[in-house]
Structure formats: structure tokens, C-alpha cells
Regions:
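Catalytic cores of carbohydrate-active enzymes across secretory and cytosolic contexts
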Residues: 1-852
């Protein structure tokens, strides 16, 4: 027998974790490292940095990894260093004092669902604005000490890291995260085993491990499908943020909504309010419906309870930005749910359609959210109005401005985004109640007491800090990826701290109009190369790997930045993350934003700049519509001049050039020869901090959600649940009765002839008698007047409610009086609607019949 040259079976690898141990004197460091409180407390970050500054930079400011890699000798040296040990002790005492305060039990409790959370660059479970906002929200919930928890995903690869090739092509790289080296912990059951949640996907289960992030006092639960219990088709569900095809996207949204609710249920967590931050999480309400129905309620009764305690926040300004799923794909995973709900398939999928009977229409998560959440809000005042129009087809009997779509303008977490240098200024000059009373503009007005020289010195220190950061971070990377060492060195050397520095940093979607500045290169060249008034532009941001147009913009900016006349004057900084963002929003002089109106739902990067004395130059869109104050920044008009976008771009570009040439640079460089700074510029900075910043903190945003939505919804929800859900059952029964008889309600008689020709100053009485078919005063009537205008420009002139004046059996007589005060041409009609004081608003039961 011939002997084989090799013979081996496959090894059965088993995981083993070797943990770095800390001396008992440093045991508190592990607790500190595993609570993201350090992410917004500079004393804690400085303490970790002091343990080993070089290693701290090497591990990307990740305290968990820092402690893992500290050498035995270094740990021993730390214990012997009295000054450093005192620093450790002081930080831990501050942390414990913060953590040991009991939650505010008087405020409504909230469960918050989101696809991404931006807490710190060390935990890559975010991509952009939505995630950063959600992360800031959790931090403020912790600071405000409310009863709050959140659900999201632990992504194996997170969002991509970005580099640029020698010709400016974006290179996306997905780096695997080592979960054991992250500031997270396994959520354990009573037996010490990691909690696993079994999530039903039609005909099989997906098994998600549950991890926990301690965000100060708040718990964020993260689901992870990348484990051996799942097939090769389901492990990737939590691989990448917004990764894969539409089938994987649906699987992600099932996991977030249904899996998220099952997680809370398994952990014994019940909250007053369930907040869907974007439509991705809408299926949490499907699971809640199932739970109530399993408890003995009908579908309609369950819907009353689910809607009352649910809030949907939309961040998308256009219908195309929402998620839509083909019926076949949706049925592949969701086909079992109609039976669980006790309704038909058409009724179920119709909950995600604007027109439920249109079988060609795809299922939309945002529509499902609107149909299962009592309250809906946009993320700025303008976006609230945009959302009213966007969702208007869901409530066809009402005009957009009548819809119960509210708004809460986004804010930013002050401790996270305010540079240490500014924190020290605020601590020195502002009232001691500042952090707990951030929306109090009178406190911020103390900025006027800060000497001008101190304001200027703070700004210059942060500009120098940004320049140092760029030189430290990008020198090696640019030499490695972008060739031509002489050109790289020239760029870095030409960064002039005395130049007016302008930042344009955000996601590179085409509607952000990053190209606008480059409309007239000759004019731009004169602006940046003015020897008396030099200007420098920093660009940064990622384009989605599937967005060729966005990547093309990056490539174009890179190419321009390498032209001799723009070398060191136009600079693109790759891999925009939270760390780079913090340096930029505090280090530049002006934050520029040029979105296509009205496609900026809110935008928050400009708000972060405000906290650091950085002045905004922006189109009046998103938050800046509300935030702009004359003498505290610059604005491009809100109204479009041209419908042709190309013409509008040219006009906006010319406006920006003009502002830079005639207003901004003369102001900045009007420096006093003796003082060395521009008093006029410092005045703008002070105005900006005093009059704008107080209104855009995350503290104000959280308080707005409580004041506008959480508290009132919780109060109503508790009423519906009381006495074995008595009120919920009554409302469901009433709606069923109205729905059953609605089509048979008819007009018995009417008198509206006097409305044909009216002279101003006259009062006209209109009378209708309605047969309510035994509904017992369940109908309301109103006279709706519109201004005569094109069909696509409908404006309500007046809505006049009818009063019920007489009843005879099922016949109800209503009267309304029209007071003709303003001459003009109008259209009118009479609208009939179900009337019940127990409803939160009309769109909760949007039956409408136009009669007459």
C-alpha cells in the first residue's frame, strides 16, 4: 500500500478569551471603560489618555482596548503614581455620584428603536446623521435621568472606512469589529448565559445574541445574528449597516422591530411609549399587536392600545427615501402574520399601502408606521410641513395643513460636541445651573461678559488643534495612498491658521450640493488666493458605496484640490467619523451648508458648530430656517428663484461668492492692529452663541418630545388600559359601529342656497339634516372654504364647524354661520366626519364624506 504524503482532518476550533487583569487598585477602570459615560466627559477621557498616551492614540481612544493592551509594568507604574491614581479616583467618584441618582419616576418611560447609534467612533454601529442623533439622544436621556432604554444592532462590520486613491476614487473598506474589545457587555440571564432571542421568520427562527451598551444610566440592547446558531444566509443580517439587497434589508427590519420587542419582553421590560426613530423599526408595533391579541383582545382593540403608546419620527423629506418591499418578498417572510392578527392577507399588507386596494403597490414601512402610531413628527418646523404634504395621501379627506403631523427640531448633545476649551469658558462665566437649564437663553447671554480677546484666543487655539490633528492623522495616509510626496507636504504646509477656514462636511448625497462652490473656478481662485484675505475650505464626507453620483462629487473635489491654484486651499479629508467631526465643528470659522430646498430634513452639524463659536453660512432649509438670526450668521434665501435646478445652482453659487467677497472676509480680516483680532467678528460669534445655541441642544429636544408627545400619550394610554382595557374596547366598538354604518348615513335635507352670491359684511346661515343611522350624535359637520387657486396650490381659507341644533329620532339638524368679511373667489364644500372626544385627532379615524 502506498503511503499518502499528507493525511489530516479539519480542526474543531473553539473560542477562548484571555482577559487582561487589572490590579485591585485599578479595578474601577474596567467599570468605567464599559460605560460610554466617558464618551462625553472630558475628565474621563483625559484620565484614560494619561494611562498611556501613545497606546490611547493607537487604539483609537477605545478604553476597553487600552486596558487590554496595557503592559504589566505599566499597570504597576500607574499604581505607584500618586498623581495619576488621584486622577483615577476623582473620575470614578464623579462617575459613581452620577450613576447613583435614581431615575425620575414622574416622567413617562420610553423604549427607543433605531437602526444605528453614534455614541463614539470606538463603537462602529452608525453611518451618519440618524445614528449620531440617536446616540446624542441616549446621552441626554441619561443626563436628564429619565426611564429610557433603546434597541439596535451590533454590526460585525459597521459602516465602511473611507480612503481615496491617487485619482480621488473612493475606496470603501469594511473592517470586522472584535466584540470583546468594544465598550459593550453580554446581556446575561439568571444562569449567567448570554441572552438569546428567537425571532420568527416564516417557517424558521433566527437566533439573536443580546449585547448591552451602558450609556451612562441608559441601557442600549444590541442584537447580533452573526453566530453559529444561524445559517450562512442569516448570519449576515447584522453584518453591515444598510448592507446587502432588499431581502436582507427586510430581514434587518424584521429583526429590529419584532426581534427588538421580543428582546424587551424576554428581559421583562415594559415602557409607556414605544418610539420608532424612522420607519425601519415599525414592525415593533406588529409584535405588540400580536402580544395583545395573544392576551385575549381583538385586532381592533389591540390597535387602540398600540397606537396610543407609539410615536413615529420621520427623517426623510421625499417618498423615494422610504423603504418599499414587493408583495412577494414581503409575503415570503411575513405570510404567517394575518392568521396571528385575525385579519386577511389583503388587510394586513394594506396597512403598508397608501391605497390598500391597489395590489400593485409595494409595502412601505413608513406607511405601516403611520397606520400604527398615534403620533408622527418631522425633525424641524419646515420638515414637519414637508411631512404633512408627503403623508397627505394617507388621509384623503383632509388637506396637508390639517394633518396631525407635528415636529420636534433636532438638537445636539452639548457635552459631546462642545470642545473642552469652550466647556471651560462656559464653566467659568455661565451660571452653575447651566447644564441642567441649557435652553435658558439668559444664561447663554453671559457670553457677552467674556473678553473679546478670550473668545478670539479660544477660536485660534481650536484652529491650531485642528491643523495639528490633520497633520498627525493624514500625513502617512496621504503619502501611502495619494503619491507625490512633494504635493502632500505642500498641502500640509500651506494650511494657514490665519486664513478664514470654512468647513463643508457631511454625507455626500447629491442633494447636499457639494459641487456648488466649484461653479465658477476662476472666481473661487481669486477668493482663496487673496493675499490680504486668504480663505481655506475643508471638505469631508462619505458617499454610499452604491451612490455613483456622490462618489463622482468626491472625485471632482479631489481633482480640484490638486490643481496648483487650489493646493492647500481646497482640502478633502477622508474617512469622516465622529472624532474628525469634533475637530472640524470646533476648528473651522464657518460651517457651510448648501442643500437643495427643502430636502434637508433638519441637519445637525451646523448646530454642533454653534456650540463652538463657529458661524453658519447656509441655505434657509432644515433647522436653519428657525435658527438664523441676523448678525449671527449668513443665509441664502429659502424661496427658489428658478424651477430649473441648474439655474438655481448658478444663482446660489453666485450668492455664496458675493457673501464671501463682500461681507464675510472683510468682517473677519478687519483686525485691530494692536489687538490682533476682529472685534466685529467676535461680535458675530457672541451673537451666535447667545441667541442661536440655546435653542438647539439635545436637552431642549428631549424636553420637547416629553412636552409634545410622551407625557400626553402616556396619560391617554394609561386611561385606555385601565380596568382591563375598558376604554380601548369602547373606542374599538364605537369605530366598528361607525365603519359599519358610514356608507348608509345620508343627507335628509339642506339649505345652502344663500351661499351663491354674498356681499361682504353679511352673515349667512347654512343648515343640514343628517340621518345618522342610529349612531347617536357620532357625526360632525364643517363648512370648508378654499381660496380659488390652481389644483396643486390648495389653500384653506376658513373651516366653520356646524352646531347640532335639533334631534328627531335618527335625524340630526346642524347649523353653521358664514361671516363674509373678505371679498374674493372661493370654493366650498361640507365635510362630514366621525366625532368622538376620546379620539386624539381626526387622523386617528380618518373617515370623511363630502356631502352637499
Amino acid at each position: 500500500m502506498k503511503i499518502k504524503s499528507d493525511y489530516s482532518n479539519e480542526p474543531q476550533w473553539k473560542e477562548v478569551t484571555v482577559k487582561s487583569t487589572l490590579p485591585k487598585e485599578l479595578a474601577c477602570l474596567d467599570e468605567l471603560a464599559h460605560n460610554m459615560w466617558w464618551a462625553w466627559n472630558y475628565e474621563a477621557r483625559n484620565m484614560f489618555k494619561a494611562l498611556d498616551e501613545e497606546l490611547y492614540e493607537e487604539v483609537g481612544h477605545n478604553p476597553v482596548q487600552l486596558l487590554e493592551r496595557l503592559s504589566y509594568d505599566r499597570k504597576e507604574a500607574i499604581v505607584k503614581d500618586k498623581k495619576l491614581m488621584k486622577q483615577v479616583s476623582d473620575v470614578y467618584k464623579k462617575f459613581r455620584a452620577y450613576m447613583d441618582v435614581k431615575p425620575n419616576a414622574k416622567r413617562a418611560s420610553v423604549a427607543y428603536f433605531c437602526m444605528e447609534f453614534g455614541l463614539n467612533q470606538a463603537l462602529k454601529i452608525y453611518s451618519g446623521g440618524l445614528g449620531i442623533l440617536a446616540g446624542d439622544y441616549l446621552k441626554e436621556a441619561s443626563d436628564s435621568n429619565v426611564n429610557f432604554c433603546a434597541v439596535g444592532f451590533l454590526y460585525r462590520f459597521g459602516y465602511f472606512t473611507q480612503s481615496l486613491s491617487m485619482d480621488g476614487q473612493q475606496i470603501a473598506k469594511y473592517d470586522s469589529q472584535n466584540f470583546n474589545s468594544l465598550p459593550i457587555e453580554r446581556e446575561l440571564d439568571e444562569n449567567g448565559n448570554q441572552v438569546v432571542v428567537d425571532v420568527p421568520y416564516r417557517n424558521y427562527m433566527v437566533h439573536a445574541l443580546v449585547w448591552r451598551v451602558n450609556v451612562g444610566r441608559i441601557k442600549l440592547y444590541l442584537l447580533d445574528t452573526d453566530n453559529d446558531m444561524n445559517s450562512e444566509y442569516d448570519r449576515p443580517i447584522t453584518h453591515s449597516l444598510y448592507g446587502g439587497d432588499w431581502e436582507n434589508r427586510l430581514k434587518q427590519e424584521i429583526l429590529l422591530g419584532i426581534g427588538g420587542m421580543l428582546t424587551l419582553k424576554k428581559l421583562g421590560i415594559k415602557k409607556d411609549i414605544y418610539h420608532c426613530n424612522e420607519g425601519h423599526a415599525a414592525l415593533c408595533n406588529l409584535q405588540r399587536l400580536c402580544d395583545y391579541i395573544d392576551g385575549g383582545l381583538t385586532f381592533n382593540q389591540a390597535m387602540e392600545l398600540v397606537r396610543a403608546s407609539s410615536l413615529y419620527t420621520v427623517h426623510t423629506p421625499v417618498p423615494a427615501g422610504h423603504d418599499y418591499f414587493d408583495e412577494e418578498l414581503f409575503g415570503k417572510y411575513m405570510g404567517d402574520y394575518p392568521a396571528k392578527l385575525g385579519i386577511s392577507w389583503d388587510e394586513f399588507i394594506g396597512m403598508g399601502r397608501t391605497n390598500p386596494d391597489d395590489h400593485s403597490e409595494r409595502f412601505c414601512m413608513s406607511t405601516f408606521a403611520c397606520n400604527t402610531c398615534q403620533e408622527i413628527n418631522g425633525v424641524s418646523k419646515l420638515h414637519g410641513w414637508v411631512s404633512q404634504k408627503m403623508f397627505a395621501p394617507l388621509w384623503k379627506g383632509y388637506f396637508p395643513e390639517e394633518n396631525a403631523v407635528g415636529y420636534v427640531t433636532n438638537g445636539v448633545h452639548l457635552p459631546t460636541w462642545t470642545a473642552t476649551e469652550w466647556r471651560k469658558v462656559y464653566d467659568k462665566y455661565f451660571d452653575k445651573s447651566f447644564m441642567s437649564d441649557q435652553s435658558n437663553e439668559s444664561i447663554w447671554h453671559a457670553i457677552y461678559n467674556v473678553p473679546d480677546a478670550e473668545i478670539w484666543e479660544t477660536r485660534m487655539a481650536l484652529k491650531q488643534k485642528l491643523i495639528k490633528y490633520i497633520r498627525d492623522k493624514f500625513t502617512k495616509q496621504w503619502l501611502r495612498n495619494q503619491g507625490d510626496p512633494a504635493k502632500v507636504v505642500s498641502i500640509l504646509e500651506r494650511i494657514n491658521p490665519n486664513a478664514l477656514m470654512i468647513g463643508f462636511c457631511r454625507r455626500f448625497a447629491t442633494y447636499k450640493r457639494a459641487h456648488l462652490l466649484f461653479t465658477d473656478l476662476e472666481r473661487l481662485e481669486k477668493i482663496v488666493n487673496n493675499p490680504e484675505r486668504p480663505v481655506l475650505f475643508f471638505f469631508s464626507g462619505k458617499a454610499h458605496p452604491a451612490d455613483g453620483a456622490g462618489q463622482g462629487l468626491i472625485k471632482r473635489i479631489f481633482e480640484i484640490s490638486r490643481m496648483p491654484q487650489f493646493l492647500g486651499k481646497i482640502i478633502f479629508l477622508e474617512d469622516y467619523d465622529m472624532q474628525l467631526a469634533r475637530r472640524l465643528v470646533s476648528g473651522v470659522d464657518i460651517w457651510m451648508n448648501t442643500p437643495t430646498r427643502p430636502l434637508e430634513a433638519s441637519g445637525t452639524s451646523g448646530e454642533k458648530a454653534e456650540m463652538n463659536g463657529v458661524v453658519n453660512l447656509s441655505v434657509l432649509d432644515g433647522w436653519w430656517v428657525e435658527g438664523y438670526r441676523e448678525g449671527a450668521g449668513w443665509a441664502l434665501p429659502e424661496k427658489r428663484t428658478y424651477q430649473n435646478q441648474g439655474y438655481q445652482d448658478q444663482l446660489d453659487a453666485a450668492t455664496i461668492y458675493g457673501l464671501l467677497e463682500n461681507d464675510i472676509t472683510p468682517l473677519y480680516f478687519n483686525k485691530d492692529a494692536k489687538k490682533g483680532y476682529s472685534e466685529d467678528w467676535v461680535k458675530v460669534v457672541k451673537n451666535s452663541i447667545a441667541t442661536i445655541a440655546p435653542h438647539y441642544t439635545m436637552k431642549r429636544q428631549l424636553d420637547d418630545y416629553y412636552d409634545k408627545f410622551y407625557e400626553s400619550q402616556a396619560k391617554r394610554s394609561h386611561k385606555l388600559e385601565a380596568n382591563d382595557n375598558k376604554l380601548a374596547k369602547e373606542i374599538a366598538l364605537w369605530k366598528e359601529s361607525v365603519a359599519e354604518r358610514w356608507d348608509s348615513i345620508y343627507v335628509v335635507s339642506k339649505d345652502e342656497d344663500a351661499l351663491q352670491d354674498i356681499a361682504t359684511g353679511h352673515k349667512i346661515k347654512v343648515t343640514y339634516t343628517i340621518d345618522e343611522q342610529g349612531l347617536n350624535d357620532a357625526v360632525g359637520l364643517e363648512l370648508v372654504f378654499l381660496k380659488n387657486a390652481p389644483v396643486d396650490d390648495v389653500n384653506i381659507h376658513k373651516v366653520i364647524p356646524f352646531k347640532m341644533v335639533k334631534t328627531e329620532g335618527n335625524h340630526y339638524t346642524f347649523e353653521a354661520t358664514f361671516d363674509a368679511t373678505v371679498a374674493g373667489a372661493y370654493k366650498y364644500a361640507v365635510r362630514m366626519y366621525p366625532k368622538n372626544d376620546l379620539l386624539p385627532h381626526r387622523q386617528d379615524f380618518a373617515y370623511v364624506k363630502w356631502i352637499g
